[in-house]
A protein has these predicted regions:
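Structural signal for conserved beta-strand scaffold positions within catalytic alpha/beta enzyme cores
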Residues: 1-4, 51, 95-97, 173-174
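Generic alpha-helical secondary structure signal
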Residues: 12-16, 31, 35, 81, ...
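Active-site region of PLP-dependent enzymes
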Residues: 21, 154-160, 167-241
């Protein structure tokens, strides 16, 4: 069904914007962004959640942060952005057919597509139906491949107590206005791997690996013009979590 985007009560949204306005902190990892990130980690039961401008950039950054080269087995039964992110990361998509009952990637067919050039498997959770993570994880481990999930359709979905945000090496979530939870535009990468989360940082902050607090100390010494993050979007949607 086509539905209208969910919206918080106007009064709550205005209050969030007012507090943002009063703080004068409009970008660069502000309080609203950190509050949303903390709420996401708690709700999705995952140690790390890296926020991005949209789901496409989150997936593209994830592929680049993993340092992958070669072919990525994925599914054509998805929004075009999944494939575009693979191509923009300098990788080659290899399409795998889906299962008829839940429209998710068929693990047996995925394994049959593995070649010496395969570097990762990128399945897509569909309409809230989770992929067969047990089978796909076993295949990825057997062949030494990364397992990355497009979880745009699986916000706060779990199986046997395991959150979709914890499946595979990492997962991408979209917060586009058409999603169950949205920030009008937005997305994130979730992972339990601290090193991968660290490697995502330069893709968020103009190539910089330095911890944010340390970077701010340098800015106090050497003023520059910088900008990242969208607290106007983040602030208004924390109440929805």
């Amino acid at each position: 069904n086509v539905t209208r985007s969910s919206m918080p009560p106007m009064e709550e949204y205005v209050e969030e914007i007012r507090s943002l306005w009063d703080s004068h902190w409009l970008t660069n990892n502000g309080e609203k962004l950190k509050k949303l990130e903390a709420a996401l980690k708690e709700r999705l039961d995952v140690p790390y959640a890296a926020l991005f401008t949209n789901g496409h950039l989150a997936l593209e950054a994830l592929l680049k942060a993993l340092g992958l080269k070669g072919e990525v087995i994925t599914t054509p039964f998805t929004f075009a952005s999944t494939t575009h992110a693979i191509v923009r990361a300098g990788l080659t998509p290899v399409f795998c057919d889906i299962r008829e009952d839940d429209y998710t990637m068929d693990p047996a067919r995925a394994e049959a597509l593995i070649t010496p050039r395969t570097c990762a498997i990128l399945p897509v959770h569909v309409y809230g139906n989770l992929c067969d993570d047990g089978a796909l994880s076993a295949i990825a481990k057997k062949h030494g491949l990364k397992l990355i999930y497009d979880a745009a359709h699986a916000f706060h979905v779990s199986r046997d107590g395991v959150s979709a945000a914890r499946m595979g090496d990492a997962a991408m979530f979209s917060f586009h206005a058409t999603k169950v939870f949205h920030t009008v535009e937005g997305g994130c990468v979730t992972t339990a791997d601290p090193e991968l989360n660290r490697r995502l940082e330069p893709h968020k902050e103009k190539g910089n690996f330095m911890p944010f607090a340390q970077l701010m100390d340098l800015f106090d010494q050497y003023p520059v013009v910088v900008g990242c993050g969208h607290p106007f979007r983040a602030g208004g949607h924390v109440p929805e979590l």
